[in-house]
Amino acid sequence: MELERATELVEYLNKTLYIDGDRVIPNIKHQIIKLDGLSKLLVSGLIDNNSMELKKGHYAHENALTTVVPNRNSIFASIVYAVALSVVKRTGEKCQIALGTHMGDFDNKTQTGIYPDCSEEFRTALEHAFKIGNWDSDKVDYYAPYNITDKTGVLKDGIDSCEYFNLDFKEIYSRTNTSYAPIYVGFIDGNDMLERGVWLSDYKSGSSVERIESFIKLGLEDPLQYAEEDGTLVSWDFVKKYVT
């Protein structure tokens, strides 16, 4: 689901992006890197056909530990850093990479959170290892811009970016899905939205709850369609009531 949504969103942005009212060709690239076989070796509630059950609930609850993937961010960061070093080799220019962690993943002030590999301490240590272990590492900047804010701050920045690029935030965010337990619904007679089949979002998993809370805090309605596990559509008011 995430790959489908990411591909669709990149295609949409490449067709519709404007800056100060002028059409631009951003040439945003989306490349899929396969790690075939790795998922069979790891234990996590987020991995398909895994022995661990994905439990529902807020990140603040202990059951959210089922969403931990062993060493996830160092795996992703290592791959991206290797690509960045290769970009430096090919172009001779500096390269910048970013990790999308935030304080909802790990609070750097209180040193608490479900995901210690999202902490600034971990990111700094990993960057240090990358720099002492690679040539040309002085030409790669590796940072986590959202480690000083939570998911609400991330959403606010996304909305501000939509405004800057003259994008409809409802159109953009309806093309995203944050759910740990997405629901695929095929054709339903009489419902144009579901005519071709779409991915809907649950509203009970930790990632969905945090997203819903962020929209509520900003006084906005999430344009994403939420549903029960059986595919029954639920309203935004219903979702808000459940979360609050």
Residues of each region from the PLM?
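Cys/His-rich Zn2+-binding cysteine-cluster or related metal-binding knuckle/ribbon modules and their
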Residues: G133, I148, T152, S161-S201
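NTP-binding/hydrolysis catalytic cores, primarily Walker-type P-loop NTPases
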Residues: V243-T244
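Iron-sulfur (Fe-S) cluster-binding segments and ferredoxin-like electron-carrier domains
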Residues: I183-L200, G206-K240
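ATP-dependent adenylation/nucleotidyltransferase module used to activate substrates
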Residues: M1-F169, S208
